[in-house]
Design a protein with these regions (language model features):
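Surface-exposed extracellular loop regions of Gram-negative outer-membrane beta-barrel proteins
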Residues: 3-20, 55, 59-66, 101-120, 159-166, 209-229, ...
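Extracellular loop and loop/strand-boundary signature of outer-membrane beta-barrel proteins
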Residues: 27-32, 69-80, 87, 119-130, ...
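C-terminal beta-signal and adjacent terminal beta-strands/loops
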Residues: 15-21, 266, 321-323, 379, ...
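Repeated loop/turn-to-beta-strand initiation elements of outer-membrane beta-barrel proteins
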Residues: 3-6, 53-56, 98-101, 148-151, ...
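Outer-membrane beta-barrel signature, preferentially recognizing the C-terminal barrel domain
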Residues: 74-95, 131, 175-183, 232-243, ...
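Gram-negative outer-membrane beta-barrel transporters
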Residues: 194-196, 201, 209, 314, ...
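Transmembrane beta-barrel wall of Gram-negative outer-membrane proteins
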Residues: 1-14, 25-66, 84-96, 144-147, ...
C-alpha cells in the first residue's frame, strides 16, 4: 500500500562497565566499583499519505535504562540511576504548488530515579531521588515560495513541568521541588535569490516569551538543614526577547560559495536550575529563580572552496558575545563546612572567538578523507559579582581540537579509521586546575548483506588504550570493542 506504512525499531544494550576512578584518587575504604549499564528502546511510527496536501504520521518512543554511578556501600546494586521515558508525537504536513506546511504535536513523560548513598561523619546515609517531568508542545511552520524568494512564518509552544524530591531512606529528611516553564515563540523568515541565484539573502526575526511559575522548594530535616533557609514559594518570572538573523551568501561560480552572517540567540534556563536545590554533577547547588535567559550575538564568515575536482576546503571564523551567560559558580558558602555550594548564575559577558576548517578529499571513487581543525577561545569578560573570574577560560572547553577519518567503501567491506585530539581543558572556574590533552584512534569495519537487509559491524574505540582523564574525577574506559548486528525488516 503506497499510502500506508509502518516503521518499527528497537534495541537493547548491556555492559558490566568499568571503574573510572584512577588509583591516585581512590580513598580508604574504597567504595568505587564498575559503572554498569543496561538500556533498551522501542520506536514505532505509522504513516498515512492519502494526498500531497494532507499527510499524517504518529510515532511512539519508549526508552528505559539503569546505569551504575560507580560507588557501592550497602545497596545491592550500589548507586545507580534509572530513566523511564515515553514520548508520543504526531505530525501533519503537505504541500500544493508553492505552498507547504507542517504541524507537529508532542507529549512526553519522564520518570527518573536515582539511588544515592554516602558516609557522613562515620554514619551511613541513603536517599532516593525521584522526579516526574511532563513536557508537551506544538510547532507549526508555513512556507510559500515565490519566483525569487521563499517566505516562512510559524509559531511554537512548549510547556515543561517537574515534580521531584530527594527522599532519605536512613532518616525522615526530604527535599522537594516543583516548577513549570512555558515558552511561546513566533518567527518569520524570507530568503531572497538575486542576480541569477549568485546571491542569497536571508532575513529572519523570532520572538520568544518564557514564563517560570508554580515554583516551590522545601527542605525538612537535620541532614538537609543547609538548604532549609531557601524554603517556600519561588518567585514567578517572565522573560522575553526579539532575535534577528541576517545572512548573505555569494556563489560567483560552482567552485566558490562564501557567506557572512549575524544572528542573535535566546535560551531560557532549565527547570533544575530555576527551582531545584540539592546535588548536581558539580556538587551541592541551590536554585536560582531569578536566573535570566542567556543571550548571544554571533558573527560568522566562511565558505566552501573547491580547489580541485576532488578537493574542497571549508573554513569559517566566528565571534560570539554572550550576555547573561549561564554558568555554575561557587556561592562562597560551604556544606558541612567543607563542600563548596554552587549556583547557576548569569555571568555578565562572555566572549567566544574561534576558527574551524574542514578539508575533504576524494582521490577516487570509494575513498574519502576528511580532516577538521577547530580553535575555540571562550573567556569570561565582565563578571561584576566575581571579578577574579574575568579573562578566565570556561571550564571543559579545549582550545584546540583536531579530528579526521579515512573511509573506504569500494571493497568487500566498508572500513573506517578515525582519530581525534583535544588539548588541555580547565576543570575549575579560576583555571587553577586542568586535565591534559589526549589523542584517540578508532577503527570500524561493517557490511550489509542480503540486499541491505542484514547489517554486521564491529569497531574498536581507543585502539591504543589511552586511559586519559575525561573530567577532573573520572578516567576514560580505555579500549572498547563493539559488535553490532541489525536487521532491516522494512525492505
Amino acid at each position: 500500500n503506497d499510502k500506508f506504512a509502518i516503521f518499527l525499531s528497537g534495541y537493547y544494550n548491556k555492559s558490566d562497565g568499568f571503574n573510572n576512578i584512577p588509583d591516585s584518587l581512590r580513598t580508604e575504604p574504597d567504595y568505587s566499583v564498575a559503572r554498569f549499564m543496561k538500556e533498551g528502546g522501542l520506536y514505532a511510527k505509522v504513516l498515512y499519505n492519502p494526498t500531497a496536501l494532507f499527510n499524517v504520521d504518529l510515532a511512539y518512543d519508549l526508552y528505559r535504562d539503569k546505569r551504575g554511578e560507580g560507588e557501592k556501600i550497602q545497596a545491592p546494586d550500589g548507586e545507580y540511576r534509572h530513566f523511564n521515558h515515553n514520548r508520543v508525537q504526531s505530525r501533519f504536513y503537505g504541500e500544493k504548488g508553492k505552498f507547504s506546511y507542517q504541524a507537529a504535536l508532542y507529549f512526553q513523560r519522564q520518570d527518573y530515579f536515582k539511588l544515592d548513598e554516602r558516609i557522613k561523619g562515620g554514619d551511613y546515609q541513603r536517599f532516593d531521588v525521584k522526579s516526574h517531568r511532563g513536557d508537551w508542545g506544538a510547532i507549526m511552520p508555513l512556507r510559500l515560495e515565490g519566483r525569487h524568494n521563499a517566505f516562512a512564518l510559524g509559531g511554537e509552544f512548549k510547556n515543561g513541568s517537574i515534580d521531584g524530591g530527594d527522599h532519605y531512606v536512613t532518616s525522615t529528611d526530604e527535599v522537594l521541588n516543583k516548577g513549570s516553564i512555558r515558552i511561546l515563540s513566533v518567527f518569520a523568515q524570507d530568503e531572497l535569490s538575486l542576480f541569477n541565484k549568485k546571491i542569497w539573502l536571508q532575513v529572519a526575526l523570532r520572538y520568544d516569551n518564557a514564563y517560570f511559575h508554580k515554583g516551590w522548594f522545601e527542605a525538612n530535616g537535620e541532614n538537609v538543614s543547609d538548604f532549609n533557609t531557601y524554603n517556600g514559594k519561588l518567585k514567578n518570572n517572565r522573560w522575553e526577547h526579539l532575535s534577528p538573523r541576517v545572512a548573505l551568501r555569494y556563489n560567483p561560480t560552482r567552485a566558490i560559495s562564501a557567506y557572512i552572517s549575524y544572528s542573535q540567540g535566546f535560551r531560557a534556563s532549565i527547570l533544575d536550575d530555576l527551582c531545584r536545590s540539592g546535588w548536581m554533577w558539580v556538587g551541592p547547588k541551590i536554585a536560582n529563580p531569578e536566573l535570566g535567559p542567556e543571550q548571544i550575538d554571533n558573527y560568522e564568515i566562511g565558505g566552501t572552496f573547491r580547489l580541485t575536482k576532488n578537493l574542497s576546503f571549508s573554513p569559517s571564523l566566528y565571534y560570539a558575545k554572550g550576555k547573561d551567560f549561564l554558568y555554575y559558580v561557587t556561592t562562597g558558602e560551604k556544606m558541612w563546612g567543607k563542600r563548596d555550594i554552587f549556583q547557576r548564575q548569569n555571568v555578565s559577558k562572555v566572549d567566544v572567538k574561534g576558527i574551524e576548517a574542514d578539508l575533504n578529499y576524494i582521490p577516487f571513487n570509494g575513498l574519502k578523507i576528511n580532516l577538521n581543525y577547530s580553535y575555540n577561545n571562550p573567556k569570561v569578560k565582565d563578571f561584576k559579582e566575581k571579578p577574579e573570574l574575568n579573562n578566565k577560560i570556561l571550564t571543559y572547553a579545549p582550545k584546540n581540537q583536531i579530528k579526521g577519518y579515512v573511509l573506504w567503501t569500494g571493497g568487500i567491506t566498508d572500513v573506517m579509521f578515525r582519530g581525534r585530539y583535544k588539548s588541555k581543558q580547565y576543570t575549575t572556574e579560576d583555571n587553577s586546575a586542568a586535565i591534559d590533552g589526549f589523542t584517540i584512534w578508532d577503527a570500524q569495519v561493517s557490511k550489509w548483506f542480503f540486499d541491505h537487509r542484514l547489517y554486521v559491524g564491529g569497531e574498536i574505540i581507543n585502539m591504543f588504550d589511552n586511559r586519559h582523564m575525561n573530567t577532573k574525577d573520572y578516567m576514560s574506559a580505555g579500549r572498547l570493542m563493539n559488535i553490532k548486528v541489525a536487521v532491516n525488516i522494512n525492505r
